[in-house]
């Protein structure tokens, strides 16, 4: 037999249990810690859901900083999603040094997808190429190096079948207002950091996979620091 005080205590616990379960449920967004070690796709979906849950309806007469707009004032919304790159932000495969076979496969993949051949060179696009190779193929970004200019820039990675060739714009493109400031062809960017006044574009050359002669002119700079010891 139990004690006489056990029944009141049991009723008290039952009352508390009912009160807790009668409380309206609240949904909370996921924090970052539970996502560690999960796939990048899951993290992106959770991140989008969390950002949507944090969006509040904004008064049309208020700025994001809380300042009330006066008569005649306008505020234009903008989004930084336009600058987002459409691939994962972390490697999805094990990291590895590039090999001859991997360089050839990567080159032909880019050629078949049409994502590089004939594209104007720019520092931003070159960084995107490095990120894509790192995140999708696991290639460490020390492979993307070129011979010095001016003239054709050849890849120092044997097996990579793209080279940078100087191209000339037709007169209409040079005078068009759309190309004056934002077009990569007007930036005159060069992988060696020196402005040679050339407009460069990636060009696919399958012969780069079979022709490798260190004595050729574009490889001489690789041995410029090597002594001629006995």
Curated annotation (Swiss-Prot):
Keyword Lipoprotein in annotation: yes
Lipid sites, type N-myristoyl glycine: 2
Region (Mediates dimerization) location: 127-143
GO CC term (a single one): host cell plasma membrane
Protein name: Protein Nef
Annotated compartments: Host cell membrane
Protein family according to the UniProt entry: Belongs to the lentivirus primate group Nef protein family.
Region spans: Acidic: 76-84
Entry domain remark: The N-terminal domain is composed of the N-myristoyl glycine and of a cluster of positively charged amino acids. It is required for inner plasma membrane targeting of Nef.
Additional note from the record: The 155 isolate is from a monkey imported from Kenya.
Main location: host cell
InterPro entries tied to this protein: HIV-1_Nef_core_sf, HIV_Nef
Higher taxonomy: Viruses, Riboviria, Pararnavirae, Artverviricota, Revtraviricetes
Bilayer topology annotation: Lipid-anchor
Keyword Ion transport: no
Subunit note: Homodimer. Interacts with host CD247/TCRZ; this interaction induces down-regulation of cell surface TCR/CD3 complexes.
Pfam families assigned: F-protein
GO molecular function, one term: GTP binding
The entry's keywords: Host cell membrane, Host membrane, Host-virus interaction, Lipoprotein, Membrane, Myristate, Viral immunoevasion, Virulence
Function, in words: Seems to play a role in optimizing the host cell environment for viral replication without causing cell death by apoptosis. Enhances virus infectivity and pathogenicity. Probably involved in viral immune evasion mechanisms.
Superkingdom classification of source: Viruses
